[in-house]
């Protein structure tokens, strides 16, 4: 996607790579999307977040099972029969952040129908990105990444059994704009883009 021209030059694709034969195969071309931001595999299905669309594929045939339009979709995480969707985006004309009523939504994995959401009163107040589920808790990065100069550094915690927002962890001034999440043992790690001039890693005890 060419931001200066505001048009797709080469559409995103989904592919597979065989490390033995060293052959890459294109499985699908997402012609209606500017970019793809996440892909996860759960059981017999592949879920893809691409621009403003959530795709569900059959992993054996890579045929599309169903899709759901979701403005600002970013990253995905599955818990039981629900798929969590983080959200955030910017206006192509003004480059200002798009303000959503909710930056964290939940959909049914069976048909991708809407299930529920946490709005900006009961959940994250700014744009969100990566997520990890551990012991029925959903950890989600809150970075406000699309409001340049006002990045946040927070990890939100959702109790998935009640789908309630139970905690926020402040990453401090050097932990702004968390982009990625990893878990190893009883530690949670965030990779932070800060203001774009550098990066940092935060470690959180779970």
Where are each of the predicted segments found?
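Asp-box/WD-like beta-propeller blade repeats and closely related beta-sheet repeat scaffolds
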Residues: 65-105, 109-132
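Short, solvent-exposed loop/turn segments at conserved positions within beta-propeller repeat blades
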Residues: 5-10, 49, 91-102, 146-153, ...
């Amino acid at each position: 996607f060419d931001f200066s021209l505001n048009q797709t030059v080469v559409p995103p694709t989904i592919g597979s790579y065989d490390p033995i034969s060293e052959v890459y195969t294109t499985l699908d071309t997402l012609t209606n999307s500017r970019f793809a931001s996440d892909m996860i595999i759960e059981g017999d299905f592949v879920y893809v977040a691409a621009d403003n669309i959530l795709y569900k594929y059959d992993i054996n045939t890579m045929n599309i099972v169903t899709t759901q339009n979701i403005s600002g979709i970013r990253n995905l995480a599955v818990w039981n029969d629900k798929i969590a969707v983080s959200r955030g985006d910017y206006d192509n004309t003004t480059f200002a952040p798009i303000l959503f009523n909710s930056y964290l939504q939940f959909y049914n994995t069976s048909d991708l129908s809407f299930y529920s959401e946490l709005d900006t009163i009961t959940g994250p107040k700014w744009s969100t990105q990566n997520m990890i589920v551990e012991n029925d808790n959903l950890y989600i990065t809150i970075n406000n990444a699309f409001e340049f100069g006002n990045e946040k550094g927070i990890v939100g915690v959702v109790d998935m059994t009640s789908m309630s927002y139970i905690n926020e962890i402040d990453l401090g001034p050097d932990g702004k704009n968390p982009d990625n999440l990893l878990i190893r043992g009883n530690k949670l790690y965030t990779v932070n883009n800060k203001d774009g001039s550098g990066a940092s890693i935060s470690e959180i005890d779970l």
